[in-house]
């Protein structure tokens, strides 16, 4: 109560004060009074409260609330006042005010002009000038040359490691050797030390010699005994008379260094075939001959029944002493000494491999030929230049090897024989022009392969067969007859089934049983198919494979009985006669006459190739017992090897098992079968075919499709009449071979038995040319003869043509069957090797000693710049690159060399230093042709040097006349691009990263290569194919030798080998793909990340120097602008360009990297998935179609890539000419309608514009609309007038011109163009021509169209660029340097006025003016100042144009557009129609002349190839 009283007193005092104050204030101002009253009241209340209420009481919160209410009321009051009083008052005052502005017209116009200028500036320089603000994208610089230093310099190793390295390097010539074979060959090896100057008579050395350390000079006895040569080496001192009786002179052949063999390929074949006896033909008039008694004929001479033909076999070798008596006597003496040698005694246990029957001998006169000596090194001596260590493998080691491991021996002989043909014969034939000697050997070997049919098939039976063919010929007509008529074979289906589908099963089963037999040492077969006798060939061979399938155990028992006693079975033949007692047929009544022909023909074939069946079938040796396993075999099968030479599987090109070549050693592998039984078993493999006169059965340079046995008629062995030594080394890219498989299919497929169809003289291309030039006959094959023997057995290309001289009936055995026989029976290969060694002329023998087979690894340097020129190199397979050092420290690629090309002739002949450094891009096989051999041949056979002189002269002429090499020295793109894509033999397809469908890509590329690829086909390899062929051990240490040889054989067989890296990164197969490739294709998905992939990092780690190409795979035929630049930005090693390919593929839904567990990315991914699912049902379905789909297969992207890899690209070069260039559009349309694919496009001026449109869209429809739109802009005079400026540098600013081009191309870069494209400009800052292949397309196309005076130059990296037509208006030479095979060049430039002028030594301008307007003046008008300047500017272009017209492979086109001016863009439709009409007429003429490279015609030509087309006619 006391507090309340105090409060009341306080309130009363406050009210009294307030009342007095209010009264005073009201009198002054009522408004202020109200506010003051409120303030005083508040203060009074607060004062009273503070006096009454103590601190920290609840009344303090009441004060705060009152203060807040006061503030809120103040704000509400202000807002209400603003919206109800202040704002309406302000608006009322504004709208009620009236303003009057007064100005004159000038001010108004100026204001409007300023406003328009501002808008114009914004539009002109901010919107329309967008092209000038693009981010800078300079041209991509050409990548530097990859030349990595050698990992191992020559001569660094020493001691024991060096010894083994040199030894292994020398025996590489044998191919791969398994551990037991290697041990057997080297366990009796001897070494010998030679001091400097010591001479070794190799003629007395019976073995294989090689240099381990040091250097040896190889000399040959000179054939010019009576003549002295000042330059040839001579041993005339008294100390050396013992080695040179009668002062014999010697010629230096070669120098042998570390790791090289002293023995030649001929020597090795001689060592392997010492015990093989030669046999003669079997005529009707006499039984089979045998070697005559001593004194009658020299041992080893081939016998000839036709004495009158002996003169034809004499080889025409200048200076070769074939008839010297003392030489003959010395050869006979050496032969006798050999028979008494202890080595001969050791061979007594060797199973007989004789090819001669044991009937009484009939003495015959020997055929004159090369002296047959028993030495493996005839007329050869060696002299050590320094202290030298040599190793000798004696001949006894080779004889033991034949006895123990005959299958391995056959493979080694096959390798040596193949290299002998590739190295010696091919070099002599192609490079030295020794076609006569090689053809003489072909002719002589025919006499050893004649086997006559039995008499009962020569008379009425042969007439009935010819009558069948005659009736069929009349029925089907002459056109079909040209392809051949085959006798119907009712058992063909059974043959194909037994040979293809069931062969693998039987081989695997037989192999497993054989392994069981070896391990358990028990009889191998106890099942229904058990082998009754160990005399039979081993299971899985040719006989067992087919007979087990056809006849079961009964027929096998019969076969075994026949094999053990073949002669009684012959006597039971009802067709046998005393005259032909060696031929017999089966007595089954169901055997008809056609089967008789097949069986007899096949038996004659087998006897001709060496399967006589007279060898010891059951030799008395432990090797014939199946219960005995040799020591080497027990070691090899006892577990992993304990030496560096691990046990390896066999090289079997047709089996998929992994049987070792040594596994057959215990049973002599191949007891020579009875040819009658083998023929009976394989009679369904042979075809009886009729060919009319003039048919070409085998063409020079192609692989033989099989063996031809002449039944009736005559075959002619010919060579082209103009030059008998065509280039067989390079013929693989020109001539169709006998293997049409483009996918590496099994050789025993359904088409393996089809006989090849002949090429007639009226066929396409080369056949027409040959028919016109004619052929030169070398020999005649009569009935009973064999054609294609050497080429078929050795699987090498033919040196000759085989042509039907008359209507001929032949028996044809396909190559697949021959290969199986050769693989199973080594005697076939040994027989041919023996025949070749016996018939080899002395000149070829000495060349064989001098030539060296060299194998180099990837990156290895053969010689360096400045080295002495010691040898010429010939490339067998692989790839080499020649580079030269530049002054700035870089390297410039001069050339690349592929298969069949030669390097270094000019330096060797001029004895000058090397002009560059030569290194191997990949593993390469070479022939080293030493300078010493050239000097020796030049002295004894000067005519040989003519061939090499012609090669050098032709090469220098091509170098001088090649316009592509002129003016390109300072160009950013090197001239080596011309050789970079030519003669490619291997291509590897690698993904950029995992997940790229390289297998599908490879399949599509192979499909394209089969249509437009090399004539001899292409094959595709992946890891599965390699493992299927070589087994699971294909990639180990020793397996690499086997693999490299197999890959080399494929390169020799096919024109292109495609490797597909379908494995992980760090696998041996991926490494093999990179090391074996001439060109690497990195395939990436364009929509994926452009980061460097793991495969690329792996390749960079391997330091590959091969050509590298980037292939971007798109879902649609369109590339987003700038996408390609992102891919190329970090890949400076891409030095072969890039390709855009359209291929539908399914993207990999499984992420390559494991997803992270962060919340953000996971949520984002989930939202994207939900959005995609929702849009699937809610959005309108958009039909995704490519921007352009090719209407013909040959225009597809894979065909374009295939043509580029094969060097068959078609280029289109468009010239400049202003509005006349509209005709380009019409010509392109005509080319598309004619079916001509365009792979590369180049242009100048208006040609650069039209070419850029076509390169971007690859279709004529879009370029027609865009070109017409641009022509409309250029025809507008208003745009031209608005672009005028003060003519300091040009009459226009160039803006409108830039806008027109930019609106056409946008931000697209040249790298984004679908086709490969370039344009040229004239760099007036550096006075040179420049070619542009990267950067913004609109800039360089605009620069190429910048006519001086009309448009200003375009600035690019400080240089000023003008129209490229000032230097070269038709860039054919540039297109040729890029590797185009066929070039279509369209010229639309103006023609110069060549009217003769005679206005005198001085000229009055006034007279010239009136003369121009005087219609009666007869004096021609002098040129104006502008015309003189224009002609001066195009002076160099005229010369380039004339060279382009004569460029090989260039098709020059010039439509009739001379009536149209440079600026007549308004006549678009008219000029377009002129070009289209001209293109149609011109291409129609080319089609009629047969010049037009139509794809349809190419396919038709391939359809006529006898190795590809199916059989058309069959009786």
UniProtKB/Swiss-Prot annotation:
A motif (GXGXXG) lies at residues 1216-1221. Its main location: endoplasmic reticulum. One of its GO terms (molecular function) is lysophospholipase activity. Residues 1212-1376 form the PNPLA domain. A nucleoside 3',5'-cyclic phosphate 1 binds at residues 670-789. Residues 278-303, 519-580, 617-639 are annotated as: Disordered. SMART domains: cNMP. GO terms for biological process: phosphatidylcholine catabolic process; regulation of phospholipid biosynthetic process. Residues 543-554, 566-579 have a biased composition (Polar residues). Residues 1-59, 124-1515 are cytoplasmic. Inhibited by organophosphorus esters. The active site is at residues 1245, 1363. A motif (DGA/G) lies at residues 1363-1365. It catalyses: a 1-acyl-sn-glycero-3-phosphocholine + H2O = sn-glycerol 3-phosphocholine + a fatty acid + H(+). Gene3D superfamilies: Cytosolic phospholipase A2 catalytic domain, Jelly Rolls. It is found in: Endoplasmic reticulum membrane. The chain crosses the membrane at residues 60-80, 103-123. A motif (GXSXG) lies at residues 1243-1247. Coiled coil: none annotated. A nucleoside 3',5'-cyclic phosphate 2 binds at residues 835-955. It is a multi-pass membrane protein. Its EC number is 3.1.1.5. Belongs to the NTE family. Intracellular phospholipase B that catalyzes the double deacylation of phosphatidylcholine (PC) to glycerophosphocholine (GroPCho). Plays an important role in membrane lipid homeostasis. Responsible for the rapid PC turnover in response to inositol, elevated temperatures, or when choline is present in the growth medium. This is Lysophospholipase nte1.
